[in-house]
């Protein structure tokens, strides 16, 4: 029997162990998509306790922020909401999480937590209800007194070279500017352009948001569709000046429905007048804006990330109580492969297709995405159109293996830009280590089985590429 999470954790062959320890383990991290706070990076926040880091909670502005993976674990163990997002003391909240964790057998949360405890806190034991007090005291002592345990310290000891945050077009990026001007910050932090609120014409709050966008670009209001595209272009250019390498689109599904500018303008005027738009009208507007944005991304060398097939806020009662991104989302089954291809084809018609990374929350879409990739590659960069890393509910061993196997079967795994945390926690960089172990085990098994040669030079290039080098090239770091 193997020891629990020893140095060969998840590395099931000699080749896998060699690839991981020789090439993967010490590579820098490019965390090109996450949800961490640039303010906390600049201010070099020091957390008071492990519950603040792991469980989050109410923020000073009244919003909720935290790891909703952990919140779902607690809810699934019958923990009352007052211990999850409520006002119970942090020590009690941590106790409830520790009591739930042993139930996570086979769940990546169990591995992630123990990887974090070992790497950052030197704890070699097992977290459960009985050890919670010991772990609480150990972690809090380090968080409060160890200079390497501030936000910047955690990033630096994780060997992170690049962080791509997620930012709204109306954000002034003041914290990014401060980070950029601070010579003591050795890693790069760049904004990512997330214009969902300007695209979701069918959702409540659209007209109000467009009013805010108008103010940011110095207008009283955005009177027509040309004004909208001009405003978005102005904001993209500002983001590019601040070092933006990627955009991100969180879509229910990827639409494609052609329309003239006049049609789209009429739809926009209708929405701004407070009238409801039909699903068909929304798709026409969204398609028009996505094509415009894609062309701007191409011009400015910004990658376009498409996240889709998530059905959000399905528990109406809890979503109304706590708001979005609090753990009430699920995998959707929208079929939009043809629309994705049509969008890329429209951009390709004028040689203005940007680098694109496609993520579906539904793993049933893996093979479809894999076949789309090969239709739109070009000489601009190897792997210009990417199948994004196993996302959200799929960033576990089976999901990661399936995504990489699908990519290997239908495209070039060797050009994959690799892992991202998509996280709100500064301890989550261990997920890159988790991914690297799974990657090396997968490739190592192919070598052990005689399906790929034991070619040291080729294997080094592939492993280092997927761990960091491909992302460095892709995002022009």
Give a label for each model feature.
Residues 2-300, 352-354, 358-370, 374-477:
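Metal-cofactor-binding active-site regions of metalloenzymes
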Residues 43-44, 317-319:
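Short secondary-structure transition/capping segments
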Residues 279, 328-334:
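A short acidic, glycine-rich active-site loop
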Residues 304-306:
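C-terminal amphipathic alpha-helical interaction region
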Residues 310, 315:
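Hard-cation-handling environments
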Residues 319-327:
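Short glycine/proline- and charge-enriched loop/turn segments
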Residues 334-340:
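Divalent-cation-assisted or electrostatically stabilized phosphate/pyrophosphate-binding catalytic cores
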Residues 343-349:
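Short, basic/hydrophobic alpha-helical segments
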